[in-house]
């Protein structure tokens, strides 16, 4: 039976707080093993990659080569259904257009003292994109991670993807070429993260690493952070749907299951003010579950982490939604637009009954790499800015230094930093 929380219950606040603090991931204690892998790749380079790939992915990289060739990508295009390639092109173009609007502008101005100030934006020179292998090897994620980098002007976009038993998803290779990925290497796991961070004989190092992965990949990203930048440590996917009784229960059920089929630890939440509607949605979920190819995954997710929250009215839904801070928030109520300005915490908001979150996954144009596990309270989804950095600009002439220098000297001396004070005073003959 799915968890049901009723706002009218006297212990609702206690139950809701417990619900928010519930853990959906079993943390594997992998840090020691991962650190050993990372250190070995740093020391031994390609030979460590060859060994780990034989051991973990059952592939002989000495025979296949570490790098994926252009001929292999050509073959992937030949193997891919033309209709899927066209759909990926549509997705790419929409992602590109939306993210182009995020490009920041340089700024430079002169203040009242004649001091010139400003900021200049530049792209990161090289980034690494980790793409999981196996069932989580999604071409849409390649587009979502690579296209903002391309729009930002990153010179070198490097993709690593494991090839268990030598197999690569051809659509992942197709998406990589469509998105302008520069290099592709058939390595995965913590060893791939280490290779991107420190470099090997074959793989040149990058400045930032993005993309999802398992506990080993996440641990490796934490370990190499500082040597390189990273995007985020993402958890299981989640959706919160705020819906009134005028919605079709089958539609809402389908949206809940679209998250549930991702992962047994994914979370799907319905928030409504109508108990009869909630029951209708639950019944629709049970009917639809048995039609899915990933029935077992979706069933486990819905059973273990799904929830129905019954509120007194939708005014009460707003603060609760902000506390949940969901990765995906669907608002399917009569005046959905009126809700939007009052939502502070959400990774992405899907407005109205004709905007299922799945459109955002693929072809909406917004990025689907979003903060999970309530981290939307303090972070944002992936964007062009994640592939850029801002440099401050400052220019003074002698007049401006005379105007500002004495205050700088005063503060430096108050902080006990004589050399700081002297750096200004020597120019002013003080």
From Swiss-Prot:
One Gene Ontology CC term in the entry: cytosol
BP GO annotations: L-histidine biosynthetic process
Active site (record annotation): 327 (proton acceptor), 328 (proton acceptor)
EC number, as in UniProt: 1.1.1.23
Keyword Mitochondrion set for record: no
Catalytic activity: L-histidinol + 2 NAD(+) + H2O = L-histidine + 2 NADH + 3 H(+)
Record-listed substrate binding positions: 237, 259, 262, 328, 361, 415, 420
GO molecular function: histidinol dehydrogenase activity; NAD binding; zinc ion binding
Keywords annotated in UniProt: Amino-acid biosynthesis, Histidine biosynthesis, Metal-binding, NAD, Oxidoreductase, Zinc
Pathway recorded for this protein: Amino-acid biosynthesis; L-histidine biosynthesis; L-histidine from 5-phospho-alpha-D-ribose 1-diphosphate: step 9/9
Pfam families for the chain: Histidinol_dh
Chain residues that bind NAD(+): 130, 191, 214
Domain of life: Bacteria
Names of required cofactors: Zn(2+)
InterPro entries: Ald_DH/histidinol_DH, Histidinol_DH_CS, Histidinol_DH_monofunct, Hstdl_DH
Cofactor note text: Binds 1 zinc ion per subunit.
Annotated family: Belongs to the histidinol dehydrogenase family.
Protein name per the record: Histidinol dehydrogenase
């Amino acid at each position: 039976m799915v968890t049901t929380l009723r706002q009218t219950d006297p212990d609702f606040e206690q139950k809701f707080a417990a619900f928010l603090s519930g853990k959906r991931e079993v943390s594997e204690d992998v840090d020691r093993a991962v650190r050993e892998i990372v250190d070995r790749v740093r020391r031994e380079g390609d030979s460590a990659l060859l060994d780990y790939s034989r051991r973990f992915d059952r592939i002989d990289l000495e025979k296949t080569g570490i790098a994926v060739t252009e001929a292999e990508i050509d073959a992937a295009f030949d193997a891919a259904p033309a209709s899927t390639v066209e759909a990926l092109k549509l997705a790419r173009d929409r992602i590109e257009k939306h993210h182009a609007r995020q490009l920041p502008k340089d700024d430079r101005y002169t203040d009242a003292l004649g001091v010139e100030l400003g900021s200049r934006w530049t792209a990161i020179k090289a980034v690494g994109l980790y793409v999981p292998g196996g069932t989580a090897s999604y071409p849409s994620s390649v587009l979502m991670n690579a296209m903002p980098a391309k729009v930002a002007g990153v010179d070198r976009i490097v993709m690593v993807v494991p090839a268990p038993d030598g197999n690569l998803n051809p659509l992942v290779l197709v998406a990589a070429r469509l998105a302008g990925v520069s290099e592709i290497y058939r390595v995965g796991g913590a060893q791939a993260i280490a290779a991107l961070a420190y470099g090997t004989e074959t793989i040149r190092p990058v400045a930032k690493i993005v993309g999802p992965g398992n506990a080993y990949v996440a641990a490796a990203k934490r370990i190499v952070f500082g040597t390189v930048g990273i995007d985020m440590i993402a958890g299981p996917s989640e959706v919160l749907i705020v819906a009134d009784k005028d919605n079709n229960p089958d539609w809402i059920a389908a949206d809940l299951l679209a998250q549930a089929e991702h992962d047994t630890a994914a979370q799907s939440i319905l928030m409504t003010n109508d108990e009869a509607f909630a029951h209708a949605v639950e019944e629709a979920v049970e009917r639809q579950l048995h039609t899915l190819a990933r029935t077992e995954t979706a069933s486990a997710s819905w059973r273990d982490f799904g929830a129905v929250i019954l509120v007194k009215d939708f005014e009460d839904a707003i603060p609760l939604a902000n506390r949940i801070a969901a990765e995906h928030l669907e608002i399917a109520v009569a005046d959905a637009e009126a809700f939007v300005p009052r939502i502070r915490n959400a990774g992405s908001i899907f407005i109205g009954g004709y905007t299922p979150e799945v459109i955002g996954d693929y072809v909406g144009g917004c990025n689907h790499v979003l903060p999970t596990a309530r981290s939307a309270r303090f972070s944002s989804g992936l964007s062009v800015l994640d592939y850029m950095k801002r440099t401050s600009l400052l220019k003074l002439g002698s007049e401006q230094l005379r105007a500002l220098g004495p205050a700088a000297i005063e503060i430096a001396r108050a902080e006990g930093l004589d050399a700081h004070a002297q750096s200004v005073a020597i120019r002013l003959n003080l």
